[in-house]
């Protein structure tokens, strides 16, 4: 692959904010803006997943240099659905909103709406063109993905001593004034990853433990004072090839009809290849199996094969197609949708 094409692709797939537009940089103060417009259509026999799914995502990242050792920073990101009526108040949501301080070689500490520690691992397989990353990660589900009330400490290269060894410590305050499946009590999480000093291979692991709320324990399914999860992952990223796998287990955490699963076992895998003319095919698999569910026993909660591809016109424009081949039984006890979905679209990002 030629170097210019590789640089474009890496910048796109790593993070939307990597190629943010710098709007201000003066006297130690810096402000970047980033965003994307995703024009997307779903095709499915499942009515709620059929039709226009377009949205706009926009955010900013700011920094201020306090002294040669200390930096303040903040980030905000929101999403606006374009398939809703203008009068629909649900068309906008805040994805991220946090502020913090970073001390050189010691690490960073921030508070707000952020990514949970468990997602540090699952992010490695959340790489499909549209779907993926949904075996155990769910928004506002303890510390599995984006969540509120997170105090997060992050340290890279382990205080400057071990290259490639990154550590996260996280605390989540209780959130009770919301839908019961989005609630959480006080909790703690941690994650660690190591790339063996900059090699093409990396491993990671995470653990979270949280109190559950009284209302959660009143549900028909899933009881227990604590919600617990652990995860591990590996990835290889070199020679135009990306391969990653993920495994996790949760206890009294994953929402199901009528409450929560007492236990889940989750697996994800993805393999992608980057052609030098811009095409990136993708093949993946996602499975979440619920265990010991009251009145059910064991049941697949998520089970699908994913086949997709992205074509990068340049660093700002891409087209994609993603086929979610659902493997759930049509007569599953929990009434989970078993229809396939095809997503097709164009993405402009900056």
UniProtKB/Swiss-Prot annotation:
Gene Ontology molecular function: any one: porin activity
Main localization, broad class: membrane
CDD domains: gram_neg_porins
Keywords annotated in UniProt: Cell outer membrane, Ion transport, Membrane, Porin, Signal, Stress response, Transmembrane, Transmembrane beta strand, Transport
UniProt membrane topology term: Multi-pass membrane protein
UniProt keyword annotation of Membrane present: yes
Family according to the record: Belongs to the Gram-negative porin family.
Localization in the cell: Cell outer membrane
Organism whose genome encodes this protein: Salmonella typhimurium (strain LT2 / SGSC1412 / ATCC 700720)
Source species taxonomy: Bacteria, Pseudomonadati, Pseudomonadota, Gammaproteobacteria, Enterobacterales
Domain of life: Bacteria
GO cellular component: cell outer membrane; pore complex
Known function: Uptake of inorganic phosphate, phosphorylated compounds, and some other negatively charged solutes.
Induction comment: By phosphate starvation.
Gene name, Swiss-Prot/TrEMBL: phoE
Protein name: Outer membrane porin PhoE
Gene Ontology biological process: monoatomic ion transmembrane transport
Assembly with partners or alone: Homotrimer.
Range of residues in the leader sequence: 1-20
